[in-house]
């Protein structure tokens, strides 16, 4: 008995010794814009912050790349000892990527031991508009101190009213295609239409927190989808503190806590659509109780995109429907109003059971959004 126990103790001590003696790893990353490294210690600290991702026992490589400052990725290149440099298309493989605790990268069943990764980013200039620019623009337009937010003003000037029109999942590539397909009679007219970057992960909860606080995810505390409230001040909080009124017109439920008066718009007519009810509720607010700040959230492009795919006829129909609502809302608004229409993220096609569209990857279709500005 004692010999068996001693053998177990020796084996356990040996295992600890071997583990402790394993060299710490560092992943080297480089692009034309950045050269960074990500250490085993950083991995261990970041792993504590994130919930477990299905199929990835470590951390998604998307998370590592975002944390290291990389934004929109076309591909990565790694060195295969047997075949030389090999390139991986990020749109095709990015969602499968995983950095494991031993420093090994996997793409599903494919394993990569290279500790040097070249990141091919899609280049954007330093002055690219960002979703973080919405909060300072809204606050400045209403004459409220921006409190040293990192973003810039998209448009200067002060207004009696500001309206945010939230076009869920209407990414910039989809906006451009809708223009070519003549679906945008109204959303093509504003004088300021700009390409912009959202935040990672490109999902509604995370993007909502970023646009409402003007702070990036790890500063506002909302860096994954399970977090639905921020401790940071939002534009709703600051507008209320300034003695101004705000109202949010939402779909059938809230993706993120807004801390203001909320009007939910369920599918009252049972037509499988909440956007028509969002529109009618918004019109009622504008006519009877127009606040200083109005938030209008259309969910239909996102809902249809997940079900049928972002390039489907159903999404085209939804885009045309929301475009008509945009034109009618503009006509209804009082003078001296600033209107900002925007997407929280885009969407890419997938072939998964029960789903034909998804988002959350560091790719162009997900990360690049339109911001459309109009004044009245």
Name each model feature, range by range.
Residues 53-65:
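Active-site nucleophilic cysteine motif
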Residues 70-99:
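Short, structured protein-protein interaction patches enriched in aromatics and acidic/basic residues
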Residues 2-10:
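Bacterial N-terminal signal peptides that target proteins for export
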Residues 50-56, 127-128:
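Short, contiguous acidic and Ser/Thr-rich linear segments
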Residues 97-100, 104-107:
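Ubiquitin system architectures
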Residues 21-26, 33, 41, 66-69, ...:
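Feature captures the catalytic ectodomains and active-site-proximal regions of enzymes
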Residues 30-51:
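N-terminal capping segments
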Residues 11-20:
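Bacterial N-terminal signal peptides
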């Amino acid at each position: 008995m004692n010999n068996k126990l001693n053998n177990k103790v020796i084996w356990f001590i040996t295992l600890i010794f071997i583990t402790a003696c394993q060299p710490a790893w560092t992943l080297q990353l480089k692009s034309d814009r950045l050269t960074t490294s990500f250490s085993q210690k950083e991995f261990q600290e970041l792993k504590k912050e994130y919930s477990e991702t299905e199929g990835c026992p470590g951390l998604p490589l998307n998370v590592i790349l975002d944390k290291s400052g990389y934004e929109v990725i076309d591909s990565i290149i790694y060195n295969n000892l047997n075949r030389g440099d090999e390139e991986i298309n990020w749109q095709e493989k990015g969602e499968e990527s995983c950095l494991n605790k031993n420093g090994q990268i996997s793409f599903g069943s494919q394993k990569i031991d290279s500790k040097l990764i070249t990141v091919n980013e899609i280049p954007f200039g330093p002055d690219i508009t960002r979703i973080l620019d919405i909060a300072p623009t809204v606050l400045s337009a209403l004459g409220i101190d921006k409190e040293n937010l990192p973003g810039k003003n998209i448009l200067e000037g002060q207004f009696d009213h500001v309206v945010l029109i939230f076009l869920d999942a209407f990414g910039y590539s989809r906006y451009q295609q809708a223009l070519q397909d003549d679906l945008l009679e109204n959303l093509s007219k504003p004088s300021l239409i700009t390409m912009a970057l959202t935040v990672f992960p490109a999902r509604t909860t995370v993007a909502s927190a970023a646009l409402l606080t003007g702070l990036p995810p790890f500063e506002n505390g909302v860096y994954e989808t399970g977090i639905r409230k921020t401790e940071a001040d939002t534009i709703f909080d600051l507008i209320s503190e300034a003695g101004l009124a705000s109202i949010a017109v939402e779909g059938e439920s809230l993706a993120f806590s807004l801390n203001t008066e909320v009007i939910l718009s369920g599918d009252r007519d049972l037509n499988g659509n909440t956007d028509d009810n969002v529109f009618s509720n918004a019109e009622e607010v504008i006519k009877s109780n127009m606040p200083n700040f109005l938030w209008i959230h259309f969910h239909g492009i996102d809902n249809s995109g997940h079900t049928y795919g972002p390039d489907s006829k159903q999404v085209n129909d939804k885009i045309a429907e929301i475009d008509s609502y945009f034109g009618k809302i503009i006509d209804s608004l009082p003078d001296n109003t600033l209107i900002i229409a925007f997407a929280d993220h885009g969407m890419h096609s997938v072939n998964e059971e029960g789903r034909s569209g998804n988002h959350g990857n560091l790719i162009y279709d997900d990360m690049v959004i339109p911001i459309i500005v109009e004044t009245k």
